[in-house]
Amino acid sequence: MRPRCSDMFMKLCILLVFFIVLPGCNEERPERKKELLVYCGITMIKPMTEIAAFIEQEYDCRILITKGGSGNLLKSIKANKVGDLYLPGSGSYIQSALEQGLITDTVHVGFNKAAMMVKKGNPKGVSDSLDSLVDNRYFVVIGNPESGSIGRETKKILDKKGIFSDVVNNVQTMTTDSKDLSRCLKNDEADLVVNWYATSMWPENKDYVTVLPISSEYAGKKKLIIGLLRFSRYPEIAEAFMKYAASDKGRAVFDKYGLYDVK
């Protein structure tokens, strides 16, 4: 008996599918890029993003940057034990991470310094004295010492001046980080804040804020230090990142964003 046309058609279809699919079985999947995780305080996100882009090209890798308050980032590192690099806004967090055995190596990449800030042009004529922070004529906002580096640094400054409790009683609110402090000024939610000087250099902020420097008697330059996390999956790339960030080229990137040559 001659096979029916439908049977012949089915056999041809099966053969066709076989020849189409079979070559695909031998194709190798592209190798997945190495992926690094960097914990970065918000004030340093711009230079770190720029340096990360350079390292990605040089080492054909992918770098993820998670940003936030330095204290909150350290808590996340301690809890999750994943990641490659940590750059907080103050060296005190690096010291804490070293004491907890979370970091194996460090490099110095820049400086941070706190300053008082008001709306552009200082329309309310706020004095550059720290005592302005206890003046109830002004809406004052500061960072929370428990969540971010600027909050911790603000507390140190005001404790040294002996007015921290008085300032806390006068503030409208405490924010988690430097980005929120800038937002408060720009959105007319504050007359006066204490923030990292570098934030006044950001393109999105510089037309909205005026800096009132704090005397070096109370506010000194703070070293910015990158730490290599002990559980880094790709320490050779992480170390290359650190080396570049600490080089003249890397420091020039930090300086561009107000994080090196700080007066």
List where the protein language model places each region:
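Exported/periplasmic ABC-transporter solute-binding proteins
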Residues: 25-58, 66, 71, 75-81, ...
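Short active-site segment of divalent metal-dependent hydrolases/proteases
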Residues: 87
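Bacterial N-terminal signal peptides that target proteins for export
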Residues: 2-13
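Hydrophobic anchor at the start of a short beta-strand
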Residues: 63
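Bacterial N-terminal signal peptides
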Residues: 11-21
